[in-house]
Amino acid sequence: MIGAADLVAGLTGLGVTTVAGVPCSYLTPLINRVISDPATRYLTVTQEGEAAAVAAGAWLGGGLGCAITQNSGLGNMTNPLTSLLHPARIPAVVITTWRGRPGEKDEPQHHLMGRITGDLLDLCDMEWSLIPDTTDELHTAFAACRASLAHRELPYGFLLPQGVVADEPLNETAPRSATGQVVRYARPGRSAARPTRIAALERLLAELPRDAAVVSTTGKSSRELYTLDDRDQHFYMVGAMGSAATVGLGVALHTPRPVVVVDGDGSVLMRLGSLATVGAHAPGNLVHLVLDNGVHDSTGGQRTLSSAVDLPAVAAACGYRAVHACTSLDDLSDALATALATDGPTLVHLAIRPGSLDGLGRPKVTPAEVARRFRAFVTTPPAGTATPVHAGGVTAR
């Protein structure tokens, strides 16, 4: 049996700066140790896909992320692992438990996943190994992980059987509890016509500080942003719908720069729990811009459910420090100026009309190229500062 301290020391030795996940009884010693370890940040998330997205953001911000999960949660992780971390070639550590291990007694809901866990990691193109029960073998396992992360620049998996890690006491502080206030703009003389997404993005670029990092959601938002002005400060998500906010969270926790997430209503609704995650961990430098057109533009304009949801009120209830509900481009300018000058997280909601540019193209740079130039931008000290931006973990090539 190994100690949780040995496991955490191995992770920090790899350069892991953030661990995010959903608890499993097999993971209890590891989680309890990480919570009390000053060298590593632990983020509770609402579901396992968020953990993978936070890990991606951690690397993009200059660190190295570790996503932890019960193997039953690998299904939730599969989308960001295969459509974000793999095409963008983002290194990360994934620790999954082995419930339902063949030959061991367990609950019926774990039997199938227990049989296919290793195969699922293989299908996700992840090299992986068992977490052993001796410290000597653990050092060997971490050496293999380090080599894989550096050579393949892809996530590496550890499979944790039952009873490998000794018990560890929990020493957790009380969580932050807060709700924000919604500022609703309804000013006489301002146009009632909803702006287009391209006009909103043009206004964003006009207001955006040059030192700000931007994470844009998959689909037309990223394609239009790229068309308007392709910048090193932009990270265009090409997959992992619903994960922009938690990728942005991972970035924001690793840099003093302002981080702006450009999101859509369909994307936010797909992982609505991410609002609670952002609100709970409360990065002061995060601005979450939601462009709400009420439809899935990228797939033909089918309606989302945003007309039935007050997204600004939900964000306020989830702990965003400030929320702005905008109806015009001038509202957007005012809200962005306020958000960028005050502590967040701040959500800025703008109702826009459906539709996009005719003949809209796609980025000519690969996801891996976008990820590396973005990481280089984020980890370069902003002009006029002497404090280096944090960079840890696996060095980007």
Curated annotation (Swiss-Prot):
Gene3D superfamilies, per database record: 3.40.50.970
Function field: Involved in the biosynthesis of phosphinothricin tripeptide (PTT), also known as bialaphos (BA), a natural-product antibiotic and potent herbicide. Catalyzes the decarboxylation of phosphonopyruvate (PnPy) to generate phosphonoacetaldehyde (PnAA).
Biological process, per Gene Ontology: antibiotic biosynthetic process; organic phosphonate biosynthetic process
Pfam families in the cross-refs: TPP_enzyme_C, TPP_enzyme_N
Protein name (database record): Phosphonopyruvate decarboxylase
Catalytic activity: 3-phosphonopyruvate + H(+) = phosphonoacetaldehyde + CO2
CDD domains referenced in this protein's UniProt entry, alphabetically: TPP_PpyrDC, TPP_PYR_POX_like
Free-text disruption phenotype from the record: Disruption of the gene abolishes production of phosphinothricin tripeptide.
Highest taxon above the source species: Bacteria
GO MF terms, alphabetically ordered: magnesium ion binding; phosphonopyruvate decarboxylase activity; thiamine pyrophosphate binding
Record-listed E.C. numbers: 4.1.1.82
Family: Belongs to the TPP enzyme family.
Pathway in which the depicted protein is active: Secondary metabolite biosynthesis; bialaphos biosynthesis
Keywords (A to Z) from UniProt: Antibiotic biosynthesis, Decarboxylase, Lyase, Magnesium, Thiamine pyrophosphate
Required cofactor names: thiamine diphosphate; Mg(2+)
SUPFAM superfamilies per record: Thiamin diphosphate-binding fold (THDP-binding) (SSF52518)
